Amino acid sequence: MASRFLAGLAALTLASAAFAGGPEQAGSLLVYPCYDNTRGMDTFITVTNTNLDVDNGTTKVEFVYIDGSNCLEFNRTRTLTPGDTLTVKSKTDNPNSTKGYVYVFAKNKTTGAASSFNHLIGTCRISNGGSGSDLEIQPFVYKAAGADGANTDADSDGIRDLNGAEYEQSADQLFIPRFVAQGPATSELIMINLTGGSKFTATVDLLIWNDNEEVFSSQYSFDCWEKKELSYISGAFTQSFLESTNHATGESMNGAETGL
């Protein structure tokens, strides 16, 4: 899979640039930012075929699980009939991996080749049995560039290229509209290196605004996939740092600083 990194807050759906893949559309490739098979956690991955054509609406889909620790992949292929919805439990579907991300792409129902089938939507639900909390995360959805039914692997390299020729490009900038200062709150950022996986280190440039439109910069480097607390990524996300800035004293959230 070739593109730039994706990043997303665990409790927030992110929209990409207008030309890039995003959550509010049907497409041929769905990227689910996180699955969690650790003790007490359950992840349910759903994909729906919105094509209702009884003659031409059937497609195969391949689930590709990417282990977050080493970027090794595990694959399963299913068939979706017109209007069909499939939900899998990642702990059962891929029991030998703890955490990571998964992508699902359409394949020709006869040849098994990756194909244009811009009718797939999905969602992911992560349940914490210990706390009783549920988290719903929407996948990043990418439309295929070719006509319906056309093979998408234009360069025959076996990789789902997010280059505009096979699938939509991915944005190189993402805006997260609000975060709550770490200390009073705990938030996590999911980062995926879609360009090279574990083959090289990806560096994310961060611009962090306080609630008075002051901006601070930071960087974070990672390999493959990471899900980290904001305070671990940069001290600029913490309550103590934001209180030390020229922040707007009347714009806190129940005493907690906020930012963009």
For the regions a language model picked out, list residue spans one by one.
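Sec-dependent, cleavable N-terminal signal peptides
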Residues: 1-22
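Gly/Pro-rich, tryptophan- and cysteine-flecked surface segments typical
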Residues: 19-260
